Amino acid sequence: MSLKPRVVDFDETWNKLLTTIKAVVMLEYVERATWNDRFSDIYALCVAYPEPLGERLYTETKIFLENHVRHLHKRVLESEEQVLVMYHRYWEEYSKGADYMDCLYRYLNTQFIKKNKLTEADLQYGYGGVDMNEPLMEIGELALDMWRKLMVEPLQAILIRMLLREIKNDRGGEDPNQKVIHGVINSFVHVEQYKKKFPLKFYQEIFESPFLTETGEYYKQEASNLLQESNCSQYMEKVLGRLKDEEIRCRKYLHPSSYTKVIHECQQRMVADHLQFLHAECHNIIRQEKKNDMANMYVLLRAVSTGLPHMIQELQNHIHDEGLRATSNLTQENMPTLFVESVLEVHGKFVQLINTVLNGDQHFMSALDKALTSVVNYREPKSVCKAPELLAKYCDNLLKKSAKGMTENEVEDRLTSFITVFKYIDDKDVFQKFYARMLAKRLIHGLSMSMDSEEAMINKLKQACGYEFTSKLHRMYTDMSVSADLNNKFNNFIKNQDTVIDLGISFQIYVLQAGAWPLTQAPSSTFAIPQELEKSVQMFELFYSQHFSGRKLTWLHYLCTGEVKMNYLGKPYVAMVTTYQMAVLLAFNNSETVSYKELQDSTQMNEKELTKTIKSLLDVKMINHDSEKEDIDAESSFSLNMNFSSKRTKFKITTSMQKDTPQEMEQTRSAVDEDRKMYLQAAIVRIMKARKVLRHNALIQEVISQSRARFNPSISMIKKCIEVLIDKQYIERSQASADEYSYVA
């Protein structure tokens, strides 16, 4: 083959080429030598001398394709009932033949057509050199275009009607020719696949659109039939079956771009159009916890934009009712434990249900959280919410030495689970106050199971609420280890004195930061330290003043405890007592009988505290009341009980200081209210300092938003705090509007 341009007889060359392309397009056998010769002929025509013949070749090829497709169209029409089969057969043959022709015409495609082809800009803005209505196309594209114009479009109505009928028969249980249906539908895609813009437009317009309409009508009627013959449970199962079948059908016949559209149409007709029916049954299904029906309903409703909210609300209501049922009427004796375990049981039950039945959907998890938040924070009318106090007591019970038969690991597991319930509390500041008081008692009276568990719990609270929430708890915990170090230093201080100092007692001290501990520094009574303790107190004050300048020690005698040996009985006993009880008992060192007046003089306690202390000793029968009167008065006298006995050689005399009294609970709640007022005032000042000017409602919303992590403030409390800050001249009402506040710099 010569590459040099030469004179070519077009008619002679075209006749040879025509014979070959007829064979190619009908998939007849063509010898390799013939193929190569025709390839050379096309090259020769494109580079012919004196004038290239590429344009004429293109025109003649186009005429051939038009005639060939018209001929095939006529034969398809003659096939009557076999239109789909014949169309499919000719399409399979023609589309492959067109691919081979495109290869044969490769030189024409690359050297003539591409160089003269209109660009996107030419098509958009116009170009004078080429007929805009008949743009040049590569031969493969031209063949497909001829098929679309001369075969598909004239047969469109017949083809679509037959395709829809065949697919309807498939839905009815018949078994149509899958290969033919898929092939015909795919031809609508294939004829425009060469287009860069909207290659599926033709397929969507002539087939997809009418198919979706027909699908909607079919499933509208199908849903109506199913509703008449089924209850809700059966209806949902049948609908899911229909959807699954339709999905398989889509994959058998349609282009992938249609899958979701078809399923969406089915869902609209069988689910969205009957939401009222499904929602009406939702209540009973959830209340009876029919897991299979819940799973089916979830799958159906999830696919519809307005489907799930009703189901979510129904589950939230159900969890709320279950939670209230589980946490009401709990026995007073073990209420904290029962309350927490009941909430955890409900939480665990519904977490499992949501994960296994509802696919772990976060919308339902949020509903669970909302429901349990309302359960945990539930309060009877005109009463306070008990949850913060109950949860603090639950922790207290777990962290005390008295926690029955539990290892540290078991306590750790329970405290980890407890955080689940804790996160639902609105009034976390109330919990913090109660927890701090109970922690103080555990630490001061040595009641903690272990300091590691105490630290672990504080860290869990820190993770849940942040550093600020636990800062005081951390300081309380730290004070205990600092105090242990101070005791060692104090003992070394005593040993290193120039003169030998004998304190006469074993002495241990806790130095606590006043700002961190929830302890009152104003004692309930005056008190004179017993002589036996004076030296220890004086030496520690000396030691402390030498080591720390500018710090003031305040002795909290009402919290101190000690051990007293009872040497006057046949059996050696050790009593663990408060300092007040110790002061009364030590008075009997000098005399077996002591009057009330003498005790008052030696201890300097007021009447109420002294009487309470004496009664605690009378209750355990360590001393006797020598008066015939039952009540203690100024004339009473007391004597040691020389016949005292106890099952234990070491025993503890409990006092009201170690028990939670109603007054103490009330004080805790009052302290919470005061703290809230200060917190809100600080929040208002922070916000106004940043914003300078703010309207009333906007300020209220920002304060609520900032406070929500600790508690839910009432609007009335916020308003009172605003008024207080106006009085204190931190903020002022704007002169322009009474509904606006300005920050006072």
From Swiss-Prot:
Covalent cross-link site, Glycyl lysine isopeptide (Lys-Gly) (interchain with G-Cter in NEDD8): 689
Keyword list, A-Z: Acetylation, Host-virus interaction, Isopeptide bond, Nucleus, Phosphoprotein, Ubl conjugation, Ubl conjugation pathway
Outcome after substituting residue 660 to K: Activates UBE2R2-mediated ubiquitin chain extension in the absence of neddylation
Annotated effect of mutating residue 664 to K: Activates UBE2R2-mediated ubiquitin chain extension in the absence of neddylation
Recorded superkingdom: Eukaryota
Compartments, as annotated in UniProt: Nucleus
GO CC field: Cul2-RING ubiquitin ligase complex; cytosol; nucleolus; nucleoplasm; SCF ubiquitin ligase complex
Modification comment: Neddylated; which enhances the ubiquitination activity of ECS (Elongin BC-CUL2/5-SOCS-box protein) E3 ubiquitin-protein ligase complexes. Neddylation leads to structural rearrangment in the complex that allows interaction between the E2 ubiquitin-conjugating enzyme and the acceptor ubiquitin. CBC(VHL) complex formation seems to promote neddylation. Deneddylated via its interaction with the COP9 signalosome (CSN) complex.
Protein name: Cullin-2
Gene: CUL2
